[in-house]
């Protein structure tokens, strides 16, 4: 803590208080960073984004210059000669169009998902060797540039190379990139992956798979439309505090079906939430210990997420919008086994880390 205070004092003494980007706001006022990200004008102590930059062992003159561009005003404090600089603290927020299901009636219990029903669903394609490119995991679009998936989809197979993320996949066995429905031409959309950031505490050798979450930054922005749009993240405390047990959640993906073969088409299934303690007792026989950062969902005979669904979204509908609640992590060896639920990474527990990755690592 003393080191952080020293860094803050040093930075404040290095940055001319008059060197601003033309803003003169009050604490708590909305602002915009030079990159166009919405934020709030805050003192350094209230902005975890800035504090993490200051605490970086690689803090440099470049970072000082960058922090100077964030200055948005001054805070006058009684008994203090110099004002406290206010910085535009970026806030990650959901897209206004997130979670909207514009099209389609839903078809449940492992049936095909109608086009546009879950437009945030992503399919990850890998080079697995011998010039073979195949889909192996799922993901969920959360903004124009970022996709959430499971860490084991990027860490556990070091010989696999993640090539691109596909949206609006209608049939993996079809060679046609576009199809026509009701006189409308609808095409697959592929985006190269610029960077892969698995959670730093994920351990591929831990069979309990804690921290099984990963952020993919795409090489270019995704253009939203009726068939490709982001899902909402559970920033709202009211969403985070909703009950889990006996509530209904939806999983979507292209994983194995009841005949043990990958599905050519996107499917989804509805599953109930379970007591955490009960789930822990079920998996204890396999020496698996689950934390409060994991969710237990399912355990119905014949209905489950499965191999190939890994990294895909666990969703719930709240007030007409869809929220990303979990990420498919692991389950029983034989999918859909009665009383053996699937395990999912609890997204709400990782929102702070996600903000750090999406904002801080862009500049350090």
Curated annotation (Swiss-Prot):
Belongs to the peptidase S1 family. CLIP subfamily. It is found in: Secreted. Residues 107-359 form the Peptidase S1 domain. Keywords: Disulfide bond, Glycoprotein, Hydrolase, Immunity, Innate immunity, Protease, Secreted, Serine protease, Signal. The clip domain consists of 35-55 residues which are 'knitted' together usually by 3 conserved disulfide bonds forming a clip-like compact structure. This is CLIP domain-containing serine protease B15. Expressed by a subpopulation of hemocytes. The active site is at residues 152, 212, 310. The record marks 106-107 as: Cleavage. GO terms for molecular function: serine-type endopeptidase activity. Residues 30-89 form the Clip domain. One of its GO terms (biological process) is innate immune response. Its EC number is 3.4.21.-. Glycans are attached at residues 46, 131, 171, 177, 206, 287, 301. InterPro entries: CLIP (IPR022700), CLIP_sf (IPR038565), Peptidase_S1_PA (IPR009003), Peptidase_S1_PA_chymotrypsin (IPR043504), Peptidase_S1A (IPR001314), Ser/Thr_Proteases_Immune/Dev (IPR051487), Trypsin_dom (IPR001254), TRYPSIN_HIS (IPR018114).
């Amino acid at each position: 803590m003393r080191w952080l205070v020293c860094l803050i004092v040093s930075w404040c003494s290095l940055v001319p208080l008059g060197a601003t980007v033309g803003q003169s706001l009050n604490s708590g006022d909305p602002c915009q960073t030079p990159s166009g990200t919405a934020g709030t004008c805050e003192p350094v102590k209230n902005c975890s984004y800035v504090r993490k930059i200051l605490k970086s062992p690689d803090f440099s003159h470049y970072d000082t210059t960058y922090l100077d561009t964030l200055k948005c005003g001054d805070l006058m404090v009684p008994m203090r000669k110099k004002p406290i600089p206010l910085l535009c603290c970026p806030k990650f927020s959901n897209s206004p169009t997130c979670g909207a299901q514009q099209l389609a009636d839903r078809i449940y219990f492992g049936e095909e998902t109608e086009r546009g029903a879950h437009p945030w669903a992503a399919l990850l394609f890998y080079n697995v060797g011998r010039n073979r490119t195949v889909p192996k995991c799922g993901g969920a679009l959360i903004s124009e540039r970022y996709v959430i998936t499971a860490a084991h989809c990027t860490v556990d197979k070091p010989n696999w190379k993640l090539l691109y993320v596909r949206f609006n996949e209608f049939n993996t066995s079809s060679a046609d990139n576009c199809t026509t429905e009701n006189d409308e031409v609808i095409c697959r959309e592929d985006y190269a992956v610029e960077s892969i950031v698995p959670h730093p505490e994920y351990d591929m050798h831990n069979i309990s798979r804690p921290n099984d979450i990963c952020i993919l930054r795409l090489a270019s922005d995704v253009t939203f439309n009726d068939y490709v749009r982001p899902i909402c993240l559970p920033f709202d405390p009211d969403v985070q505090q909703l009950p889990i047990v006996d509530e209904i959640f939806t999983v979507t993906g292209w994983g194995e079906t009841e005949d043990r073969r990958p599905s050519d088409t996107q499917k989804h299934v509805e599953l109930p939430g379970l007591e955490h303690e009960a789930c822990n007792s079920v998996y204890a026989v396999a020496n698996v210990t689950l934390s409060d950062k994991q969710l237990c969902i399912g355990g119905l005979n014949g209905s489950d997420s499965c191999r190939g669904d890994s990294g895909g979204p666990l969703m719930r509908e709240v007030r007409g919008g869809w929220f990303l609640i979990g990420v498919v992590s692991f389950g029983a060896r034989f999918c859909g086994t009665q009383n053996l639920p699937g395990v999912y990474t609890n997204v709400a527990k990782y929102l702070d880390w996600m903000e750090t990755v999406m904002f801080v690592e862009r500049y350090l």
